[in-house]
């Protein structure tokens, strides 16, 4: 409450039962945190069109205002690609060679929630992760 008062805002905490994700794969690369993020994108897409997602450990050293200049067309998100060595290591670690060159920092995502919602992306991703589709 004190933090909310200090910044003249409100803080809403949502409690989500992790059993909702019990049938999804988890590993050091796919955690419940990843699934909560996807679910939050779906929920927020009902009321806002874009969202800047930042992990709690991200330090912003400058203004984020330039991000507001990004105009989405058909893109789901704007992401920051990892450097080449991290790209290669991530692809190898995940045993997905085709990820090399496509690996990005999932802790900083500017999401086009309007497109996310229109494409019904959350149910699609959860179905894919559950192995219910090819």
Which residues make up each language-model segment?
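Glycosyltransferase catalytic domains, chiefly GT-A lineage
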Residues: 1-134
